[in-house]
Structure formats: structure tokens, C-alpha cells
């Protein structure tokens, strides 16, 4: 989503992080941003993005070079003009998917809430193998055999990565774990044709027993 009850999501919470990676609905090729309310947090973030430098001869923390370069910023300004058009096209694709897949036994789509305005970044489908008759992985393989890439967003869970082994309790996120084992994100981008959406859905539904 990018708006809730008419407010941009950057207005909620202490801070909101945005990715502007090339795969996002709005991108600057690479980069991101943080929105914040507390001026002290803003000063701290500014220092951390600039190697942790606090003053001419003072470094308070280990920081990074997280400043956006001018080329990426210029690309963002160019893309900003087209973001509404991009979202509208993505919405049409998502609605076409829903025409085919909504109400199918064993498929769960994200709930559309009236007070939320989506940016249609992804189209995730949660598969119930017992009801649908095929697992998420089997459907993904069938799509791949037809030259269609689908992603297991997001699998595996971050707290199951080997680098975090023993640091986080995997059992503390049972809902996320349940969904991660069953979710498949179907292709969604502004220039995806309705014919291709129909073909993707046909292949998905052909796996149903």
C-alpha cells in the first residue's frame, strides 16, 4: 500500500523506510529514503549515511556511504512524473488476475481494504495444497516450464537464515512461517499484457486437481 485513509504511509510510526531499487514501482535505479518525525533521529540518520561523521574531526559511530548520487536522483525525478500511470497499469493487471483467481478453492488472495490505496507492487497468492491439489512449488515449476518466472516472496524467512541462527526464535512468527511456505508471487508489471495474464492464470488453474 502507499496510502491509508488518505494519508501516505510515510506519516505512520516513528520512521518509514522506502526502497527505490530498480525493481520497485517507483525507482531511482538504486537507493532509498527514510521519513521520520523526530529531528534528533534525522540528525542521527544523516550522520550514519555519511560514514558516521559528526563534525570536522569527530566520528561518533560506524556509518556508511549511503548518499544518493546525482544520476540516481535525476532518474527518480524523471520517474516521479509517471508513477500514477505506472500504478494505474499495474492495477489493471492485478484486477485481471482477480477475475481469474478470486474464489478458487485453495487459493487465497490479499484482502482489498476500502481505506487502503495499493501501489500494486506484487500479486501474492497463498496455496492450500490440500484444497487446490497442487503445492506452491509445483505451480511455480509448471510456470517455469512455460518460460514464466514466479517468485516465492518472501521465502525463506529472514529469521531462518543461517547468519541469524540461534539469535531469533523461529516459532515466534508462526503466521509468517505458514505463509512463507505457501506463497507465490505472480508476474506483475505495468507492461504485462492481458493476454499474458490470461495465459499465466490458465497454467496456474491447470494444476488444480
Where are these regions (language model features)?
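PLP-dependent aminotransferase class I/II
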Residues: 39-209
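Short, small-residue-biased leader/transition segments that mark boundaries at the very start
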Residues: 1-2
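Active-site PLP attachment segment
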Residues: 11-47, 70
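Conserved catalytic cysteine-centered active-site region
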Residues: 8
